[in-house]
Curated annotation (Swiss-Prot):
The lineage of its organism: Eukaryota, Metazoa, Chordata, Craniata, Vertebrata. Changing residue 120 to F: In strain: swamp breed. Keywords: Disulfide bond, Endonuclease, Glycoprotein, Hydrolase, Lyase, Nuclease, Secreted. The gene is RNASE1. Swamp breed ribonuclease do not bind carbohydrate, but there is evidence of a polymorphic form that does. This is Ribonuclease pancreatic. One of its GO terms (cellular component) is extracellular region.
Length: 124
């Protein structure tokens, strides 16, 4: 079974590119990372930074998560991210996404030992 940390990496990490390569980025990535296999995941964010830099956020600014839990952390610096949002015309199994590139602070929930990101909460 996929661990929470591994799932975070599959769903949110793309260190191989510094930003979204094209407007088709989300359509390709959401499919290749298995987020359209049983339904279209409505919203997802990819982070274009090194895994080490994203894992380091777990020791940065402690903030409250959207759900009220206290194990969320906000990055000190902005990071290159790509937001993928399902379009109005998207219909499973032909999931369609709008690709939006941004530089924002990320907020992740961290758990475990080692203490690593397991959930992408928000970007600000």
């Amino acid at each position: 079974k996929e661990t929470a940390a591994a799932k975070f990496q599959r769903q949110h990490m793309d260190s191989s590119t510094s930003s979204a390569s094209s407007s088709n980025y989300c359509n390709q990535m959401m499919k290749s990372r298995n987020m359209t296999s049983d339904r279209c995941k409505p919203v997802n964010t990819f982070v274009h930074e090194s895994l080490a830099d994203v894992q380091a956020v777990c020791s940065q600014e402690n903030v409250a998560c959207k759900n009220g839990q206290t194990n969320c952390y906000q990055s000190y610096s902005t990071m290159s991210i790509t937001d993928c949002r399902e379009t109005g015309s998207s219909k499973y199994p032909n999931c369609a996404y709008k690709t939006t590139q941004a530089n924002k602070h990320i907020i992740v929930a961290c758990e475990g030992n080692p203490y690593v990101p397991v959930h992408y909460d928000a970007s600000v």
